[in-house]
Amino acid sequence: MVKLRLKRYGRKKRPFYRVIAIDSRCRRDGKALKELGFYDPIAGKTQLDVPNIIFYLKAGAQTSETVGNLLQKAKVFNQLSLLN
């Protein structure tokens, strides 16, 4: 099963995350199928590749809790429901 979740980058005490599509059996920082955006919690910046995220969600991908919250804030689920 494919999951949309965060992959940690950055240095100690200064995290930076990429939103990725990955096989659910892989480790957190394993090889991603596709990188779909980034999230910087310190600066409060988020950039998402919405068309590719919608593609993976339509294909049955599950989201982690944090990525689900990010997608709700970016109103991706609203766009997905309008397409259905």
Swiss-Prot record:
Highest classification ranks of the organism: Eukaryota, Viridiplantae, Streptophyta, Mesostigmatophyceae, Mesostigmatales
PANTHER family documented for this protein: 30S RIBOSOMAL PROTEIN S16 (PTHR12919), SMALL RIBOSOMAL SUBUNIT PROTEIN BS16M (PTHR12919:SF20)
Family indicated by similarity: Belongs to the bacterial ribosomal protein bS16 family.
InterPro entries (alphabetical): Ribosomal_bS16, Ribosomal_bS16_CS, Ribosomal_bS16_dom_sf
HAMAP family: Ribosomal_bS16 (MF_00385)
Source superkingdom: Eukaryota
Gene: rps16
Localization, UniProt: Plastid, Chloroplast
Name this polypeptide is given: Small ribosomal subunit protein bS16c
Annotated GO MF terms: structural constituent of ribosome
UniProt keyword terms in alphabetical order: Chloroplast, Plastid, Ribonucleoprotein, Ribosomal protein
A GO CC term assigned to this protein in UniProt: small ribosomal subunit
Alphabetical list of Pfam families matching this protein: Ribosomal_S16 (PF00886)
Main location: plastid
GO BP terms: mitochondrial translation
